[in-house]
Swiss-Prot record:
One Pfam family here: MARVEL
Full protein name: MAL-like protein
Membrane topology: Multi-pass membrane protein
Molecular function terms from GO: structural constituent of myelin sheath
Originating organism: Homo sapiens
Transmembrane segments: 22-42, 59-79, 97-117, 131-151
Coiled coil (residue ranges): none
Subcellular location: Membrane
Amino acid sequence: MASPDPPATSYAPSDVPSGVALFLTIPFAFFLPELIFGFLVWTMVAATHIVYPLLQGWVMYVSLTSFLISLMFLLSYLFGFYKRFESWRVLDSLYHGTTGILYMSAAVLQVHATIVSEKLLDPRIYYINSAASFFAFIATLLYILHAFSIYYH
């Protein structure tokens, strides 16, 4: 005997605001600060004398790649591309969680490069590296908060 069909489920698209309201609603309000602090990190690292290319190369890779992918996510929300996929929320949460972890590793490596640059270079390079380290930790916090807020939203 055949079992009855399962009850029909309906997929209700989420309530993603459009326009300026996107930047005022949690979790989407994290996009602009992520982009701003990410931009500051990679421009400050690029503006300094690279002490250890392997360490600061990883910082540049993480910050620049995260900046570009976050910009693509923001544009997909602004233009409504997310409506084509049902699993966009999971993808967004996984991306921001993974990026938070990668940014933490980049921030720690940037701090190490900053400590080394204190003894080797002029003070201006040290100050720029210090600011890049601080902004990298802020970006890490923003990405992790974004991941949790999109997951629990």
